[in-house]
A protein has these predicted regions:
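Short Gly/Thr/Asp-enriched flexible loops that form oxyanion-binding sites at enzyme active sites
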Residues: 111-124, 130, 265-271
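Short, acidic/small-residue loops that bind anionic groups at enzyme active sites
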Residues: 73-78, 121-143, 279-284
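Gly-rich Lys/Arg/Thr-decorated short loops/hinges at beta-loop-alpha junctions or inter-strand turns
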Residues: 44-52, 61-74, 135-136, 208-224
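C-terminal non-catalytic interaction/assembly regions of soluble proteins
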Residues: 238-329
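Short alpha-helices
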Residues: 128-180
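Mixed-charge interfacial surface used for oligomerization/domain docking
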Residues: 163-268
Length: 329
């Protein structure tokens, strides 16, 4: 294993301190328990948006703390859920009279710990559960996983909260975005968790994992490597079958890198995916390409499609000022 590490034990702490210093105009770090929050408090009465999860997916979630998105993020250890104490401390620090909305990816540890924090809070709160991974059917035992679509929920709901939407409206909007968003990923290689020191799974030089999870979970199937067009058609076909978009439907296309795939290849994937849906009459009117929901050093990417209406377009276009997303301000 070759990584820039002093010791595994202090990796997260050093990384978070560096992140907070590098973006000191936007965020601040609470050392114990760990959470990242805005440096400038939100307006009184604003709904506080909080998310979090295991580290190793940067810039998710800390990179999305700031005006127009999250009020705080709770980073756990690598691929490990943050604790209820982190979530409770973050909520108490940023709640400002409008209640708290937790945005939670659908993983058992995250769901359980956010539920505990929710029960401990003494202010109005609600939860949006993100489950955009269509690698498995909705009837899967634990439900679908939350993956790259999470940032789309955070951006759109964050804009509405910034504009003064109340807790019920923010919760309803988050659920709406989740229902019209679908993602699926492919891995060309595994990732290496620092504490483990070796790849999380073995994969042959001529194999790819279709439907891989962002923690290296096994996907839908393992197949022989094939052309980029064939890979995109496979992923986009499953997403299309799930969402069943209508001709002329407006949509956001998000190509997300897992950490070790060059932008040259991510833009190639965007070109192929956009052609897939343009041929079917979809109006790809918004886009996002880059490494936003990563899996440490995994080579691969995911495709996310979100169906849009005028309301969702307005909130997506609204100003945002975070470490990882910034426009209109």
């Amino acid at each position: 294993m070759k990584k820039f590490i002093d010791t595994v034990d202090n990796l997260l702490d050093q990384s978070l301190r560096g992140f907070a210093k590098a973006h000191a105009d936007i965020v601040q770090l609470n050392a114990q328990p760990h959470f990242v929050s805005r440096i400038k408090p939100a307006a009184p009465g604003k709904v506080a948006l909080i998310s979090g999860g295991g580290s190793g997916h940067e810039p998710l979630h800390s990179g999305f703390v700031g005006a127009g998105m999250l009020d705080a993020a709770c980073p756990g250890q690598v691929f490990t859920s943050p604790t209820p104490d982190q979530m409770l401390a973050a909520a108490q620090a940023v709640e400002n009279g409008g209640g708290v909305l937790f945005i939670v990816k659908n993983y058992a540890g995250d769901v359980m710990n956010f539920e505990i924090a929710s029960e401990m809070l003494d202010c109005p709160n609600a939860t949006v559960l993100v489950c955009d991974d269509v690698s498995f059917p909705k009837s899967h035992s634990t439900g679908r996983r939350g993956v790259a679509g999470t940032l789309i929920v955070e951006k759109i709901v964050g804009a509405a909260a910034e504009a003064g939407a109340d807790l019920a409206a923010c919760k309803a909007l988050g659920d709406k975005v989740n229902q019209v968003t679908a993602s699926m990923g492919v891995a060309l290689s595994s990732c290496t968790v620092p504490a483990l020191g070796k790849p999380t799974f073995d994969i042959g030089d001529n194999e790819i994992e279709m439907g891989v999870g962002i923690h290296g979970e096994r996907g839908r199937e393992r197949i022989a490597i094939r052309s980029a067009t064939e890979i995109v058609d496979y992923l986009a076909g499953i997403i299309d079958d799930d969402l069943k978009p209508q001709q002329g439907q407006a949509a956001l296309l998000h190509i997300n890198g897992f950490g070790a795939t060059p932008l040259m290849e991510l833009h190639l994937i965007y070109e192929l995916a956009s052609l897939f849906w343009e041929k079917r009459g979809l109006n790809i009117c918004r886009s996002l390409v880059g490494n936003y929901t990563t899996s440490l050093d995994m080579a691969g990417c995911s495709i996310t499609l979100s169906l849009l209406d005028d309301e969702l377009i307005r909130w997506w276009d609204a100003p945002v000022h975070t470490a990882a997303l910034r426009w209109g301000c």
